[in-house]
Design a protein with these regions (language model features):
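N-terminal Rossmann NAD(P)H-binding glycine-rich loop of SDR-like oxidoreductase domains
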Residues: 9-29
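Alpha-helical substrate-binding/gating segment
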Residues: 184-201, 206-232
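C-terminal substrate-binding subdomain of Rossmann-fold SDR/epimerase-dehydratase oxidoreductases
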Residues: 214-298
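Conserved beta-loop-beta element that borders a ligand/cofactor-binding pocket
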Residues: 162-187
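Conserved Rossmann-fold NAD(P)-dependent oxidoreductase catalytic core, especially the SDR/UDP-sugar
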Residues: 97-151
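Conserved glycine-rich Rossmann-like NAD(P)H-binding loop of the short-chain dehydrogenase/reductase
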Residues: 31-42
Length: 298
């Protein structure tokens, strides 16, 4: 099935930060969007959204019936928001249900939210790094091959779900695009970035990475439109770091024993987006540097 047949798209997790952005991006690009979330009705942030609990397979089937593709963003979005068991069980159940329902209904494409945490975050966890320890940073820039290295039940739920996506894509022949999304920021969040600069250790946990919510939405749309087969997973991050110092210098200060595998630009992200660029055509459009006054980050 070609991408030209994708007209009606279900966005799950539509009331969340990424979901709201994806709904807006897709509607602005001419897609007919069915928005759904278990939290519909809480604040009315997405009009016309349908309430559905995707831990129930029957509800997953019902919300996907009649759409051409799904952008699946509904999950417990971070570690520590629920118990480890609930985080793992609910996320894996939601992901399996949506993936299997999409395959059973013959959808053309599944784009879904994996996570940067599959790569080993939080980096530098604990007083000392040693091979195999949680948070071991093996090289930089980190790419998709710095995997799987889950250190929380949340990260483990995403690793398990990437395996589920690969298995279902194989027998269904439906392309799956997993987005290993970095720490999502809205424009209002950028005002706190200067507070990170005095202590680079404060953001070492994800190598000073972030991504604008509007670029996450872009990646969701590109995932629908890219010419791909099988199951692919790509890092989605901003083109730069949260820091006002060169990336090489910050890395050398905090992780002096970690090797750079290639030259990096002055403020270039240390979460490599090269694969997202080559596979999806992803080029981030937004940076905190466009929002924070120049004198604040000189």
């Amino acid at each position: 099935m070609t991408t030209t047949t994708i007209r009606r798209v279900c966005v799950t997790g539509a009331t969340g930060k990424a979901g709201r952005g994806a709904v807006r991006e897709l509607r602005d690009s001419g897609y007919d969007v069915l928005a759904t979330d278990v939290a519909v009705g809480a604040d009315g942030r997405v009009s016309g959204a349908l309430r559905a609990d995707l831990t129930d397979y029957g509800q997953a089937v019902e919300v996907l019936r009649g759409v051409d593709a799904v952008v699946h963003l509904a999950n417990i979005p971070a570690p520590g928001m629920a118990t480890p068991a609930i985080t793992f069980n609910d996320n894996v159940a939601m992901n399996f249900n949506v993936f299997h329902a999409a395959a059973s209904l013959g959808l053309a494409r599944v784009v879904w939210a994996s996570s940067e945490t599959t790569l080993g975050l939080p980096f530098g966890h604990g007083p000392e790094q040693f091979p195999g320890a949680p948070g071991e940073l093996r090289y930089a820039p980190v790419d998709e091959d710095h995997f799987p290295w889950p250190s929380t039940s949340y990260a483990l739920s995403k690793v398990a779900s990437e395996t589920i996506a690969e298995q279902i894509s194989r027998w269904s022949q439906i392309p799956f695009v997993g987005l290993r999304i970095s720490n999502i920021m809205e424009p209002a969040d950028y005002e706190r970035f200067p507070s990170y600069w005095p202590d680079p250790h404060s953001r070492k946990w994800n190598l000073w990475g972030y991504v604008d919510v509007r670029d996450v939405a872009l990646a969701c749309r590109l995932g629908l439109e890219a010419d791909v087969t099988g199951s692919s997973n790509v890092i989605v991050a901003a083109a730069d770091t949260v820091m006002n110092r060169p990336s090489r210098d910050v890395l050398a200060e905090v992780f002096p024993d970690v090797t750079l595998t290639r030259e990096v630009g002055e403020f270039e992200t240390l979460l490599s987006i090269d694969r997202a660029a080559s596979l999806l055509g992803y080029q981030p459009r937004y940076s905190w540097r466009d929002h924070v006054k120049a004198e604040e980050h000189e």
